[in-house]
Amino acid sequence: MDKDVQEITDSKQQLTEAAFSNHTPMMQQYLRIKAEHPETLVFYRMGDFYELFFEDAEKAARLLDLTLTQRGASAGTPIKMAGVPHHAVEQYLAKLVKFGESAAICEQIGDPATSKGPVERKVVRVVTPGTLTDAALLSDKSDVFLLALCVGHNKRGVASTIGLAWLNLASGALRLAEIAPDQLGAALERIRPAEILAADGAIEAVPAGTGAITRVPAWHFDIASGTQRLCDQLEVASLDGFGAQALTSANGAAGALLIYAAATQGQQLRHVRSLKVENESEYIGLDPSTRRNLELTETLRGTESPTLYSLLDTCCTAMGSRLLRHWLHHPPRASVAAQARHQAIGALLDAPVHVGLDSLRSALRQIADVERITGRLALLSARPRDLSSLRDTFAALPALRERVAEIAPNAAALGRLEAALEPPPGCLDLLTRAIAPEPAAMVRDGGVIARGYDAELDELRDISENCGQFLIDLETRERARTGIPNLRVEYNKVHGFYIEVTRGQTDKVPDDYRRRQTLKNAERYITPELKTFEDKALSAQERALARERALYDSVLQALLPHIEGCQRVASGLAELDLLAAFAERARTLDWVAPEFIDEIGIEIDQGRHPVVEAQVEQFIANDCALNSDRKLLLITGPNMGGKSTFMRQTALIALMAYVGSYVPAKAARFGPIDRIFTRIGAADDLAGGRSTFMVEMTEAAAILNDATPQSLVLMDEIGRGTSTFDGLALAWAIARHLLSHNRCYTLFATHYFELTQLPAEFPQAANVHLSAVEHGHGIVFLHAVEEGPANQSYGLQVAQLAGVPAPVIRAARKHLAHLEQQSAAQATPQLDLFAAQPIVDEQECNQPPAAAPHPALERLLALDPDDLKPRDALDLLYELRALARSGATDAQR
């Protein structure tokens, strides 16, 4: 904080007049405002610029690459300054928000012409990372959440529950949840708040890197006050109708959140009209590891594409894209919602051409972002082009509703959406009459209110716009009336409007002419008519802008009662757009509607990984069958063979089915699924002081503790990072526990071939492998899942493909042969990594390997053409081509 601010504030931000005595009046005003926002950058309006002073200026100059200047002094201290043009402030605010900073926008609210001393100023809004509503500060396709966190304690003073309340201020969507303390990390990973509000005692509970943290006084989280504040906000006597009356810490969090959000906007939150209480049992559980490993909305490298979201997002509106992101992270457990969505997709695909999918999507492309426009409307910050876009959208809704109405009889969900697309009564008429067809970007620029809406404004505009013509007409009339042929009617900024007559013609001047200025060769006059026009003309533009501002404000006020209706339309448009996008993906990518069954089971016929399939020329489809008699698949095969792809595609297809999308398969059937777990990949946690193996075991522990018979578990290469015997023992024990205790659907990929003996002990386990064909010392991956275990991992061949030098590969091959001989002699599973091994002579390693027959030739010799079906023959051609290419590559080496 600036030392000047510190001088004038105590710990409770109480100001003392003595602290201001040595400062100029303007700096006194600034310092008082800054004292109210000590942790926030204050943008102080001065004419056409926003200025920042002292340490704020230094910080802004560093973050925004501004020029830091020093002008004058106050109280003997040089005033450091940095500024940005007022018309470009949004782009600078956007940069600050990305840095996690907040900014208080301090505007001039007084009239400079009438002010004595500094013009009156006040902070009209505070821009923080979690309270963004302006289009320039928001990403079109993702939401920004402000979250408040309240820790509840039991009688012993131990944290027993955490209440969460999070708000999307741009749309007004408010949600509450109460969770156990150990679930906080997963909840924050799912919500991904941009800003977290917490009292001092609760900040320690927030995991690092989960959003900007803002300290809020503890009394803001009072549960009783929060409950009452929620009732006041929603205009209800009780929260029973929302299922929130019995909540405690969540209501306390909501109270703090509403206080903070309203304070940043400087007004009430009119668009926060409902809330939703989220329960863990409502959605399929996805922990942070699963969301990351399945690459739902972000790749493992941190990019937005290629992901499931980027593949599915062909939405025509930003609202649909944001809803897609929400659906992917909130798949409902109950299949009813998904079945309704599947039915709607089918109806869209089967619709007649004139009202079909392409026609519907073409109409949706003309739709504006009604959701965010409504949010700005409720906060009275909507701009003219927001209202014109809202008008044009409402005008397009009748035709859109007609298209949906023709399809709706075949899908109940579409019937519900058709009803939601009716504009609030009177809104379209008001917007059509009041807003110009193509308004200016800002009200201050004029040209926003339509002609014919207000007679006074039309007159002021006519005066301002027709000034030149009036002067020409007056000059013509006065020449005729006075008989002075060279009489001129003109204007200058010093004397205003005047009639100029040369010295030789002054005797013809009428009596109603009043002398305004005497020149050497002429006299300048004013008449009552010209004076009246001058009074109107000189103030017409200013008065027109003021009148337009007042009319615009009245239009905003007139639209406020229709906020809920606009939100209903926005919700309907978003869902319709997303269902249409799902239908387009199903048609384009040849996806099918999945089925839901009551029995335990996952059956996927010819399933494909949706994202990988879009990236490769040819994708090999595979089946997956899990049921009460087949609960665990032990997956073996070479690295690069497709084990992880097969596992991920199974989880993604299941997730897509419950989200409500069609799926990439020939057919798919799913029983109940309550959670999806993944233990895939290797990564350490340096910040948390955890090794790769520790991270792996932590994730495995969570699965073993929480998985149920309705959970889908993906386990990939469990047991790495320690000695062979330790890893094998852990993998064996974990697989047994999943079978005997959790009894969940499990895909268990491993290179421990000893585990393939597990089905002998547990009939619910089965072996499958990813096929590959070995050619000499090379390998061709076929990516086909086949029954039974693999016979080896082909690790050396994969290393060769990766570019490991040939001498190293040959040395490894010699050493492998020795290990295999030793293993056979000792009849042990696999040797401990830390056991001493004999060294192979390096000269032997440099000897070239013996030539091997071409793999394509071997494959051809082994097949029986009479047994081939047409589809098998086609698959064989692709296989032979792959073998031929591999052989050519090996020959080049």
From Swiss-Prot:
GO molecular function, one term: ATP-dependent DNA damage sensor activity
Record's keyword terms, sorted: ATP-binding, DNA damage, DNA repair, DNA-binding, Nucleotide-binding
PANTHER family: DNA MISMATCH REPAIR PROTEIN MSH1, MITOCHONDRIAL, DNA MISMATCH REPAIR PROTEIN MUTS FAMILY MEMBER
Function statement: This protein is involved in the repair of mismatches in DNA. It is possible that it carries out the mismatch recognition step. This protein has a weak ATPase activity.
Binding site for ATP: 637-644
Entry-linked CDD domains: ABC_MutS1
Annotated Gene Ontology cellular component terms: cytosol
Protein name: DNA mismatch repair protein MutS
Domain of life: Bacteria
Coiled coil region boundaries: none
Family affiliation: Belongs to the DNA mismatch repair MutS family.
BP terms from Gene Ontology: mismatch repair
